[in-house]
Amino acid sequence: MQFKTFALAATLLAALTAPLAPVAAQVKEHTFKVGIGLSDDHPQAQAVRHFAERLQAKSGGKMNAKLFASGALGNDVSMTSALRGGTLEMTIPDSSTLMSLIKPFGVLNLPLTFNTEAEADALLDGPFGQKLLAMLPDKGLIGLGFWENGFRHVTNSRRAINTAEDLAGLKLRVIQSPLFLDTFNALGTNATPMPFTELYTAMEQKAVDGQENPPATILASKFYEVQKHLVLSRHMYSAWVLLMSKKTWDGLSADEKKIVQEAAREATVFERKTIRAFSETALGELKKAGMQITELPAAEQAKLRTKLQPVLAKYGKEFGEETTSEMMGELAKARGGK
């Protein structure tokens, strides 16, 4: 009886493991370098480590991802270029980095467009977001999903921002993008394009008065050490794009690609959950660190929208009127047709 039980168990084990054998045979050793500009303790970095864990679990330890944080491999622009050239495997730039390569990506950064994280998820995970990702291979990139950066807010070292007019004259670092330049110049600031990796030092040395980023980045990057004032302006929603070099992707087997895609999907869920939890506590931590936080009243938000109408009109056309209209239609659906 014991022998029969053992034989039955062995047969079941063989049946369970047999389907895995062909997959294992098609999975080779891979370690993907992942470069990011943010710090090692930022939620984005935590999500990269989660991605690495899922890769290892799904590949029997054969596939892995190695994180290089704090701009060790360059800024978003240079790392994205490295992916296209095949000298770096992965990076996670702000979607605005891609608009110089593919103009329709710019619609995601149109100011005052998104209201909630939920509608951003619906847009990016739905047909519209997938259509954008499908444009990447022609530029030597593979899009594995959209991660959340969050709603952006303005900080500065000079004064509290209580009205739209209070922004006037501030020298603010912005992402190296014409859209960001025009957005903040329209609001009366002196917009200064600069790589994120240079930002802390620039604020410390008073080369710029301030910057704009989501709370998680402000806290993790310790901007509270060199910035006194934070206004919850919610002027723009910001998404990251999880990218792999097409040259790397093309060198993977079908089984390896499936593992990467599955790990990326799981890491996307993890990243959004992690950064939202982190952001909920970030404002309290920033207050404890000495930052003075203000919120623009609805009337002042309306003033921002009025000032930005020419920017919205200009870039709505530049990024493609059809694309812009499609995005707004999808957002209307996400809002229940409101």
Language-model segments: what does each one mean?
Residues 1-31, 336-338:
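Short, low-complexity disordered leader/linker segments with a strong preference
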Residues 26-119, 127-338:
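N-terminal secretory/targeting leader peptides
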